[in-house]
């Protein structure tokens, strides 16, 4: 038997079938570094339009987790796709370096007896060490960026820039000193930002407390009575017994109705709607003897249960009827609403009672409870209330309560003297900060769109921003306060610039080491140099000023404004929020044109990642077992607008999908063996109809993909590329052209036409996958034929694809119809194979019984129809002649019948043909193969 293998154009490529990503990816990273890929991208991008994605800085503490990986991969996919779309898209990674978590780590390692200078020195060293570790982990994910020159909020230039940003806000009239309740952590010994607050379940004692009336005549008059027949009290309900010693007022809603209830021994004032539930709770019987609106109770005095002072009634619309009594006890030092209401009624700061010290212990001067920690004092307060006959009810409930994100301990609101950015304070010029920010939100694009309403609600309802902290490791608030008046120095903005210049040279240490006389001279004795530091959200929230404008200038025509900020959905109250406020205060616009938020990672059951649950997916492990490209493919395939499910099984499915894409790429490369685009590329008009369709289909898909990349819909990119590889290529086109590729002459038009199409498809595909499969795309790039530069990323979307003319006879709709027929034939072939009626498809002969229109269309392929259907013969017959055993199909006007061919099998092309053995020199092969080996070669027109 003659071996005809040498006469075939068998596929051949060195591109490995097995990816070996964990081993191969580090080699590719090394190559990117050696060729200076990021620098080359900046060079070719010089004259391109700029696209700036400003990096929200991760905190420089600990190894990266899967959430970090998602965030950086999404950013990288955008940077890469924008680069391929013809933009200059730099990416400068950043790190958030100051703040309590690092200070806490240093204290744990080195003890708490460090000097402030030692603390700052050790914090700086610790942050630097953490950055290097995280940097290596981010690079391993394939993230392109200026890793040699990242921005760090602790860089001297950025510390100085932050002081200058604060100076701009002082100059604009947004900054003020005030006494206000802020989130306070006893363990931190400092105020916390809203974004540093977590909510966890906490058990608390609820108490219903009676405050005896002091103005009996006024209370009687409010209820339309001449006098009160017996003792009366108003009842409050609270979950914070520890605040009762600081009670200074009682709040009722002006529009709610309140009832005077006779319970036998005394009269109780309760919200009318809650009388029944309250009496049941107190195990009392009673009757309503009069009602009055809350507004009638205004300024009536009641007595504190155990201190000799009065508590007046103030009207407040935040009072609710959801629980309690409809009366709220007001401790202005420990509640924001309480504080605002008491101030509205004229209470001055010096009159606000604030017995809780920074460590959570009552001042020793507090009667009954001095020196006690507030949480431990709760039972003693309940006992005292019971002792004086004021306690009507107590029980323990579990409720959601604010906790410190670092220490996981309960927080309180506590009034302290702090520096604030005023939301509604009238600035030196223009609208208030709240007005500016709300307008800026309207001018910003949001992905997903619901982010706009979320951020709008937060800004509309947020209090003034407390920007001061009482810590060592932070950018200083370089203010001098007059010792007598407490006012800022009149030259504050000018002095801040002098401080910034020193910080630029020496870092924040310059301020803390500085003597006031160095700047103030003889005036120094009149001023206090403050030691407060800035909230870390002010650090990252001003990077648009000191990074985009300063150390890494990427400004647009309107100043430092990024095209995109991209972070997790928690950043609506974090970085997006603080950046918006500083941007609007300084530049009167948001520092971003568009905001993109992604959800959090959960396991396949929707549970949060937790070591105790054993469901943590570590990106480092994924890199070492599957490869970063698998993780990148999973990110691309997941709709990031909601929770992002990940598990070993989910990643394995991504690995399976990766193999299908890789195998498609390998098939393309292996069939481009011997193809030189410089000499073998055919013009579109010389290509076979099917090949022209394949290139046209690729062009249409590329247009869709460019749109999806532009709208950051990576899951659509993934699904369309995957389907293209599996269905249109693997399930249709590539199957059909195998015969032509392998059996026709090596340099025949039929083969070169297919190779031209494969080349165009490969050039497009390698670019499509480059933003997602960053490593694999560059590996594939090296194996493509023809002269090319060092990386796929140094190019733009492929421009060599051609569109089918509108009048092309075998156009898009035509091939869609053919595909439907092929699906129907394949379905029946599968049935026949399962029944052992035929072996492979090429053992089959198919007869298509078609209506006239369909028959005419299929007839256009002439004798090449069999190559499209991949059967040894394909015959057409009128639909009316279909025998009873013909199979109906889902294609209208088509029935078909498959039988096993009676003809011998060609040893070369494996088709069963009547003319096998006709040629005496080649008794084992068909006439077509003889012609392809020793004759002029077959001529194909369509497929």
UniProtKB/Swiss-Prot annotation:
| Motif annotated as 'KMSKS' region, chain positions | 608-612
Which GO molecular function entries does the Swiss-Prot or TrEMBL record give? Answer: aminoacyl-tRNA deacylase activity; ATP binding; isoleucine-tRNA ligase activity; tRNA binding; zinc ion binding
Q: What cofactor does its activity depend on?
A: Zn(2+)
Q: What is its main location?
A: cytoplasm
GO terms (BP aspect): isoleucyl-tRNA aminoacylation
According to the record, cofactor stoichiometry and binding are noted as: Binds 1 zinc ion per subunit.
Q: Give its E.C. classification number.
A: 6.1.1.5
The residues listed in the UniProt record as binding Zn(2+), with positions renumbered to this chain, are 906, 909, 926, 929
Subcellular localization is given as: Cytoplasm
Family affiliation: Belongs to the class-I aminoacyl-tRNA synthetase family. IleS type 1 subfamily.
Q: What is this protein called?
A: Isoleucine--tRNA ligase
Name of the gene: ileS
């Amino acid at each position: 038997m003659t071996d005809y293998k040498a006469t075939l154009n068998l596929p051949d490529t060195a591109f490995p079938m097995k990816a070996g990503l964990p081993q191969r990816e580090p080699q590719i990273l090394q190559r990117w570094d050696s060729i200076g890929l990021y620098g080359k991208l900046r060079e070719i991008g010089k004259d391109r339009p700029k696209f700036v994605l400003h990096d929200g800085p991760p905190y420089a503490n600990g190894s990266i987790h899967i959430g970090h990986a998602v965030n950086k991969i999404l950013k990288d996919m955008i940077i890469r796709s924008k680069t391929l779309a013809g933009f200059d898209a730099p990416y400068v990674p950043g790190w958030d370096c100051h703040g309590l978590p690092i200070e806490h780590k240093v204290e744990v390692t080195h003890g708490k007896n460090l000097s402030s200078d030692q603390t700052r020195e050790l914090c700086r060293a610790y942050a630097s060490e953490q950055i290097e570790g995280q940097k290596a982990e981010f690079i391993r994910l394939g993230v392109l960026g200026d890793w040699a020159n990242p921005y760090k909020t602790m860089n001297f230039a950025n510390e100085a820039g932050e002081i200058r940003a604060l100076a701009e806000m002082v100059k604009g009239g947004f900054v003020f000193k005030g006494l206000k309740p802020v989130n306070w952590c006893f363990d931190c010994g400092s105020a916390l930002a809203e974004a540093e607050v977590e909510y966890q379940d906490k058990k608390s004692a609820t108490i219903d407390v009676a405050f005896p009336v002091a103005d009996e005549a006024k209370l009687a008059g409010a209820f339309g009575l001449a006098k009160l027949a017996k003792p009366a009290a108003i009842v409050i309900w609270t979950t914070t017994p520890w605040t009762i010693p600081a009670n200074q007022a009682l709040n009722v809603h002006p529009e709610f109705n309140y009832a005077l209830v006779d319970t036998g021994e005394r009269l109780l004032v309760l919200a009318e709607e809650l009388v029944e539930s309250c009496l049941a709770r107190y195990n009392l019987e009673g009757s309503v003897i009069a009602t009055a609106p809350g507004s009638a109770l205004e300024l009536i005095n009641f007595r504190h249960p155990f201190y000799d002072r009065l508590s007046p009634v103030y009207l407040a619309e935040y009072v609710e009827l959801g629980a309690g009594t409809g009366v709220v006890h007001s401790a202005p030092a420990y509640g924001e609403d309480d504080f605002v209401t008491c101030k509205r009624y004229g209470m001055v700061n010096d009159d606000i009672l604030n017995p809780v010290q920074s460590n959570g212990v009552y001042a020793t001067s507090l009667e009954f409870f001095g020196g006690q920690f507030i949480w431990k004092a709760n039972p003693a307060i309940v006992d005292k209330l019971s002792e004086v006959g004021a306690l009507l009810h107590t029980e323990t409930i579990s409720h959601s309560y604010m906790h410190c994100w670092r220490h996981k301990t309960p927080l309180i609101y506590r009034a302290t003297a702090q520096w604030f950015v005023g939301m509604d304070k009238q600035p030196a010029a223009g609208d208030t900060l709240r007005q500016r920010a709300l307008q800026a939100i309207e001018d910003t694009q949001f992905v997903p769109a619901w982010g706009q309403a979320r951020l709008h609600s937060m800004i509309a309802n947020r209090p003034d921003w407390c920007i001061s902290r009482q810590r060592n490791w932070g950018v200083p608030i370089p203010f001098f306060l007059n010792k007598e008046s407490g006012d800022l120095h009149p030259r504050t903005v000018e002095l801040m610039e002098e401080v910034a210049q020193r910080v630029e040279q020496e870092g924040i240490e310059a301020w803390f080491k500085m003597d006031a006389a160095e700047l103030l001279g003889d005036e120094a004795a009149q001023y206090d140099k403050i030691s407060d530091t800035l909230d870390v959200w002010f650090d990252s929230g001003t990077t648009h000023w000191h990074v985009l404008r300063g150390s890494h200038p990427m400004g647009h025509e309107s100043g430092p404004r990024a095209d995109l900020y991209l972070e997790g959905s928690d950043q609506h109250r974090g970085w997006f929020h603080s950046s918006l406020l500083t941007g609007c205060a300084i530049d009167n616009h948001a520092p971003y044109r568009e905001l993109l938020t992604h959800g959090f990672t959960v396991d396949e059951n929707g549970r949060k990642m937790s070591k105790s649950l054993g469901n943590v997916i570590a990106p480092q492990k994924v890199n070492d077992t599957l490869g970063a490209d698998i993780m990148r493919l999973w990110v691309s395939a997941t709709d990031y607008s909601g929770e992002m499910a990940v598990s070993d099984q989910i990643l394995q499915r991504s690995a399976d999908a990766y193999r299908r894409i890789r195998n498609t790429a390998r098939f393309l490369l292996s069939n481009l063996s011997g193809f030189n685009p410089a000499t073998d590329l055919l013009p579109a008009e010389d290509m076979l109809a099917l090949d022209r369709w394949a290139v046209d289909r690729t062009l249409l898909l590329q247009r869709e993909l460019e749109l999806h990349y532009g709208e950051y819909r990576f899951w659509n990119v993934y699904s369309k590329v995957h389907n293209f590889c599996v269905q249109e290529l693997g399930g249709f086109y590539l199957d059909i052209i195998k015969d032509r590729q392998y059996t026709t002459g090596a340099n025949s038009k039929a083969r070169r036409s297919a190779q031209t199409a494969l080349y165009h498809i490969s050039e497009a595909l390698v670019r499509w996958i480059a933003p997602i499969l960053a490593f694999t795309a560059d590996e594939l790039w090296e194996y493509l034929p023809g002269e090319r530069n060092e990386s796929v990323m140094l190019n733009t979307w492929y421009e060599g694809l051609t569109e089918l003319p509108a009048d092309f006879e075998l156009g898009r709709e035509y091939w869609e119809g053919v595909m439907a027929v092929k699906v129907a034939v394949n379905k029946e072939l599968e049935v026949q194979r399962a029944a052992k009626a035929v072996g492979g498809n090429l053992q089959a002969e198919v007869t298509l019984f078609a209506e006239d229109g369909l028959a005419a269309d299929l007839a256009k392929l002439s004798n090449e129809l069999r190559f499209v259907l991949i059967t040894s013969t394909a015959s057409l017959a009128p639909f009316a002649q279909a025998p009873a055993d013909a199979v109906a199909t889902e294609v209208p006007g088509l029935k078909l019948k498959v039988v096993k061919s009676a003809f011998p099998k060609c040893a070369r092309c494996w088709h069963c043909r009547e003319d096998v053995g006709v040629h005496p020199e080649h008794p084992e092969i068909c006439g077509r193969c003889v012609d392809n080996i020793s004759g002029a070669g077959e001529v194909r027109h369509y497929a």
